[in-house]
């Protein structure tokens, strides 16, 4: 597979996912970029904005296994990872694997689980491995977490610590669809038959595991010349000296942004990254990795606004 064929494959995958998820083209793109980059996504949005449908549709189009965990305050690490259960027939312990042993894991309302459970998922995200009763178990190379949180209800939640937020390649903000898209969705849901059909929406599995590995090999070969790497570093360093930011982005953030730029370039059929790639991915890659200063918060500024100001201020290579 060459870059042209890969670009066409990704365009077809976008189309398949779009059969079920309408009006979220930019979000679909960023989820696919994260998946091919080997990262994870944190999705923030109100209930009823197709977050679960998005995860299920991506898994269907990519022919990957899918599991969902509803995070609650009483969820324990064993409920996520799995437990060793004693078998009285052979007097041995046997591992009962938890839902983390999958390809695409939807961690629904992740901020409702206590920190102990969140940290168990953190190891899986970071190392693609889990430890159960002192024994390490590997997860698949395609393991991908799409975690959601509700920005409206914050009572009884456990905010994700900075270390865990930093493990997400992107933080995506999902909003309600526009008027025309909402009408189209309601039209599609007009009958019960169409509602049941929406569960799979006729999505064809287009990407085999071999094709996924082949695509990642193409991405690894994408060139980022010194001017692009310097531009990424300058943008990240600018977050550390901005008056509106209390804590700026880390070196890991720069590395994550560079990885995402390579994927976006490959999606466009290019073997090189452009400043446009960096600018398009800057906000979703960094909005969860900076902490605004108290004065900026009092003035009503948002991470997105501050990052856009930095993007406008730092000169892009020509």
Model-flagged regions — what are they?
Residues 35-72:
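Walker A/P-loop
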Residues 30-33, 86-106:
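Conserved alpha-helical scaffold flanking the Walker A/P-loop in AAA+ ATPase domains
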């Amino acid at each position: 597979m060459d870059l042209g064929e890969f670009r066409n494959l990704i365009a077809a995958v976008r189309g398949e996912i779009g059969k079920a998820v309408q009006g979220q083209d930019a979000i679909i793109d960023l989820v696919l970029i994260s998946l091919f980059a080997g990262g994870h996504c944190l999705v923030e949005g109100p209930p009823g904005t197709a977050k679960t449908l998005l995860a299920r549709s991506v898994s269907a189009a990519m022919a990957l296994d899918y599991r969902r965990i509803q995070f609650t305050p009483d969820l324990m690490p064993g409920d996520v990872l799995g437990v060793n259960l004693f078998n009285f027939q052979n007097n041995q312990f046997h591992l009962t694997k938890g839902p983390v042993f999958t390809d695409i894991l939807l961690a629904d309302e992740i901020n409702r689980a206590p920190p102990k459970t969140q940290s168990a998922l953190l190891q899986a995200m970071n190392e693609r491995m889990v430890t159960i009763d002192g024994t390490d178990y590997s997860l698949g190379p395609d393991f991908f977490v799409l975690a959601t949180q509700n920005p409206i209800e914050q009572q009884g939640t456990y905010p994700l610590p900075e270390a865990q937020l930093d493990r997400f390649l992107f933080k995506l903000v999902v909003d309600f669809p526009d008027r025309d898209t909402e009408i189209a969705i309601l039209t599609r849901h007009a009958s019960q038959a169409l509602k049941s059909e929406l569960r799979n929406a006729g999505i064809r599995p287009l990407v085999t595991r071999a094709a996924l590995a082949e695509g990642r090999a193409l991405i690894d070969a994408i060139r980022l010349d010194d001017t692009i790497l310097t531009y990424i570093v300058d943008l990240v360093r600018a977050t550390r000296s901005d008056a509106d930011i209390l804590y700026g982005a880390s070196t890991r953030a720069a590395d994550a942004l560079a990885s995402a730029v390579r994927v976006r370039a490959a999606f466009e059929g290019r073997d090189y990254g452009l400043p446009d790639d960096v600018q398009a991915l800057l906000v979703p890659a960094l909005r969860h990795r900076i902490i605004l200063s108290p004065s900026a918060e009092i003035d009503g500024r948002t991470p997105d606004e501050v990052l856009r100001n930095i993007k406008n201020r730092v000169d892009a290579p020509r």
